[in-house]
């Protein structure tokens, strides 16, 4: 026997349980991703990098190699060479994956670039002399400018404030890595580590 309003209470309870389950799954996915990476300090990234560059993404192109694998070339206009070998006014970063026609090849821990984005990248040069982002998504910092002050802040999955919609924010809070990080402080730490 059911009473008036009982069905709506049951549906409300199911919605809450479904939402809780979805939240737990998203947090678990974020924790799984973080667990698959050992966080690297800024100093470690700087010490291992062949170059550290502050720049703007001006172009991206996706191609296939002879083996049929998809790869992406990311072209940066260099604003400042913070450390390492100078390579002129541009830097081309190569990484596996991308979108080519209807084919998508991606890794959740691969850095994501977009045209127009201001970034700081820690790169190593492979045997073909191509720049590759060091430590996957740990070697790329997004630069954001505060609207009122213009102060440049940086972040990656393990350093700086998390994006509001980033499921890894839970992990960053758990690891105590939710402090703001300015571009100036990042540069200072890179230069100090390079000495």
Q: Which residues does each predicted region cover?
A:
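Transition segments tied to proteolytic processing and entry into folded domains
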Residues: 18-20, 30-195
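Intrinsic, low-complexity polybasic segments
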Residues: 3-8
